[in-house]
């Protein structure tokens, strides 16, 4: 499927070396103030060729809105947006037609579909997340406009190097941790990492590049101001919908909510979040080990999500593969232009998937009117 969502639906389309990529967003209520710039600023955060640690393939990724906006506001009809490819070098991939790249989707696509566009990974390329980002930009605007929901992501780990900044290290100030100073620090760092040891992580990536290799990492996502009651108790749980949306990104290999796998090591007395009333008689959690979700439903605390991102599979080192046509084993040396690490560029995509899942659940749950704002 190329569509995600039930009430707020995103259909992403296009291939890495095709003419264009884009998305159709259906189910966005009318009267939401929205311009091309709202989408462009998110696309700019994920576009390639503008960082030491991204692919040299330089693309402007200029978005054009084709429908669904009138006089600066949504109309409630499908919003269609397109981004044209301008810097393809398809000849770099001609030798890969019958030799699937280890770690890529080449083999599974070839065996499932037979005829597929292998250039630059085709439909499985990270470039196809342009559609996700278009949908996410609209979802972010909807959540912010209706409920002041803020979503932010940042790198907490590169390879085996753990950063010293994460939500649980900052729990005393968790309600105020997302601010302009932090956002600027993240966005001005090539790894989108606010930790004090980010330079050590940079050196780790540079060393991998020198050795014709790639690295992965861990990203933390925080969503503030999510109201109580989003999600369902059995199927359609908030944590289930978030995990599903995030795991639909090719590079993602794992998702944790709150303390995640660490919770298996804790005692019940350590894991349980005790309650109290604040000065305004609002129910609060003393801790937030649950990551903002109890029984599949938001509890008013910040959503805390961690995502494991694998190393970029395209590496310059020689690897062993097969030739599907000749039925032989051979060595493969991948050319083309590739990211040594995808972690910083995938952050806006992951933020988008969180926003899309939340928007869909909140429309379905009555928090956002499905027709007009």
Curated annotation (Swiss-Prot):
> Cofactor: bound how, per the entry note?
Reduced FMN (FMNH(2)).
Q: Which CDD domains does this one have?
A: Chorismate_synthase
Does this entry carry the keyword Ribonucleoprotein? Answer: no
Q: Where does FMN bind?
A: 123-125, 250-251, 295, 310-314, 337
A GO molecular-function annotation: chorismate synthase activity
User: What reaction(s) does this enzyme catalyze?
Assistant: 5-O-(1-carboxyvinyl)-3-phosphoshikimate = chorismate + phosphate
What keywords were assigned to this record? Amino-acid biosynthesis, Aromatic amino acid biosynthesis, FAD, Flavoprotein, FMN, Lyase, NADP
Q: Which Gene3D superfamilies match?
A: Chorismate synthase AroC
Binding residues annotated for NADP(+), in chain numbering: 46
The EC designation for this entry is 4.2.3.5
Q: Can the keyword Lyase be found in this entry's annotation? A: yes
Gene Ontology cellular component?
cytosol
Q: Which cofactor does it need?
A: FMNH2
Pathway assignment: Metabolic intermediate biosynthesis; chorismate biosynthesis; chorismate from D-erythrose 4-phosphate and phosphoenolpyruvate: step 7/7
Q: What does this protein do?
A: This reaction introduces a second double bond into the aromatic ring system.
Similarity comment: family membership: Belongs to the chorismate synthase family.
Query: What name goes with this protein?
Result: Chorismate synthase
The gene for this chain is aroC
């Amino acid at each position: 499927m190329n569509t995600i969502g039930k009430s707020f639906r995103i259909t992403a389309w296009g291939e890495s070396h095709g003419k264009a990529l884009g998305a159709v967003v259906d189910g966005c209520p009318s009267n939401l103030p929205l311009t091309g710039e709202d989408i462009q600023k998110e696309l700019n955060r994920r576009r390639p060729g503008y960082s030491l640690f991204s692919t040299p393939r330089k693309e402007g990724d200029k978005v054009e809105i084709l429908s669904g906006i009138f006089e600066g506001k949504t109309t409630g009809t499908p919003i269609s947006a397109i981004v044209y490819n301008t810097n393809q070098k398809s000849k770099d991939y001609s030798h890969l037609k019958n030799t699937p790249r280890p770690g890529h989707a080449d083999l599974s696509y070839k065996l499932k579909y037979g005829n597929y566009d292998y250039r630059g990974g085709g439909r499985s390329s990270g470039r196809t997340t342009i559609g996700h980002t278009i949908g996410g930009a609209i979802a972010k605007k909807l959540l912010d406009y209706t409920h002041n929901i803020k979503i932010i992501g940042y790198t907490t780990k590169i390879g085996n190097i753990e950063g010293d900044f994460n939500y649980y290290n900052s729990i005393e100030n968790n309600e105020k941790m997302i601010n302009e100073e932090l956002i600027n620090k993240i966005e001005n760092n090539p790894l989108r990492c606010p930790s004090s040891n980010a330079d050590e992580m940079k050196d780790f990536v540079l060393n991998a590049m020198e050795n014709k290799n790639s690295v992965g990492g861990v990203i933390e996502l925080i969503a503030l101001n999510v109201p109580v009651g989003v999600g369902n108790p059995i199927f359609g749980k908030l944590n289930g919908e978030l995990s599903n949306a995030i795991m639909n990104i090719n590079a993602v290999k794992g998702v944790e909510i709150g303390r995640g796998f660490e919770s298996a090591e804790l005692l019940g007395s350590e894991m349980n979040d005790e309650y109290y009333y604040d000065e305004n008689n609002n129910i609060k959690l003393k801790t937030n080990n649950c990551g903002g979700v109890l029984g599949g439903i938001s509890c008013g605390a910040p959503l805390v999500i961690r995502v494991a991102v694998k190393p970029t599979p395209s590496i310059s080192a020689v690897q062993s593969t097969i030739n599907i046509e000749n039925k032989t084993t051979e060595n493969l040396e991948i050319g083309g232009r590739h990211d040594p690490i995808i972690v910083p560029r995938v952050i806006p995509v992951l933020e988008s998937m969180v926003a899309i899942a939340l928007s869909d659940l909140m429309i379905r749950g009555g928090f956002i009117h499905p027709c007009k704002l």
